C-alpha cells in the first residue's frame, strides 16, 4: 500500500525515536525529507543525517540529539497535510512558541525555516512546526 504522507511518516519516526531514547532512526530517502532534515540540523534539533544505501532501498539515518537526557525536539507536528494544504506569505508566517520554535516552509527558494523565509521575503507551504 502506498504511503499517503511521507513527510508526516518521517516526523513521526523522529518523535517516536526520541520518546524511546534511540540514538538514530531510519526513514526512506527522498529529496524533500533530506531538505527538511537539513533545516533541522541547521537549527540544532538533530545531530545530523546521512544516506544509508546498504539495503534494497535508499534510507536516511537520522542522528537524534539530546540535552541532559531530554530530547532536543519537544514537539514536532505536520501543519500542511495531503488533505488540507496550508500556504502562507512571508508576512503571515506563523511563529512557534513566541519564536522559541521554528516553522519549516517549502518555498520557491527551497525548504527554509520561518526566520530564513522572512529574511528572504518568500512564503510557501507551511510543512511542519518544531520546538
Swiss-Prot record:
GO terms of biological process kind: translation
SUPFAM superfamilies attached to this UniProt entry: Ribosomal protein S8
A Pfam cross-reference name: Ribosomal_S8
Keyword rRNA-binding: yes
Cellular component GO terms held in the UniProt record: ribonucleoprotein complex; ribosome
Keyword Ribosomal protein assigned: yes
InterPro entries, per database record: Ribosomal_uS8, Ribosomal_uS8_CS, Ribosomal_uS8_sf
A GO MF label: rRNA binding
Cleavable signal peptide: none
PROSITE patterns listed in its UniProt record: RIBOSOMAL_S8
UniProt keyword list: Ribonucleoprotein, Ribosomal protein, RNA-binding, rRNA-binding
Record-stated family: Belongs to the universal ribosomal protein uS8 family.
Classification via HAMAP family: Ribosomal_uS8_B
The protein's assembly and partners: Part of the 30S ribosomal subunit. Contacts proteins S5 and S12.
Function: One of the primary rRNA binding proteins, it binds directly to 16S rRNA central domain where it helps coordinate assembly of the platform of the 30S subunit.
Protein name: Small ribosomal subunit protein uS8
Species of provenance: Erythrobacter litoralis (strain HTCC2594)
Gene behind the chain: rpsH
Amino acid at each position: 500500500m502506498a504511503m499517503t504522507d511521507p513527510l508526516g511518516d518521517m516526523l513521526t519516526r523522529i518523535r517516536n525515536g526520541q520518546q524511546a531514547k534511540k540514538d538514530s532512526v531510519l526513514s526512506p530517502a527522498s529529496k524533500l525529507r533530506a531538505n527538511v532534515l537539513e533545516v533541522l540540523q541547521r537549527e540544532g534539533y538533530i545531530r545530523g543525517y546521512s544516506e544509508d544505501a546498504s539495503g534494497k532501498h535508499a534510507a536516511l539515518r537520522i542522528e537524534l540529539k539530546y540535552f541532559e537526557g531530554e530530547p532536543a525536539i519537544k514537539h514536532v507536528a505536520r501543519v500542511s497535510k495531503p488533505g488540507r494544504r496550508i500556504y502562507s506569505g512571508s508576512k503571515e508566517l506563523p511563529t512557534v512558541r513566541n519564536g522559541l520554535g521554528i516553522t519549516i516552509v517549502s518555498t520557491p527558494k527551497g525548504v527554509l525555516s520561518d526566520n530564513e523565509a522572512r529574511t528572504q521575503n518568500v512564503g510557501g507551504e507551511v510543512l511542519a512546526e518544531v520546538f
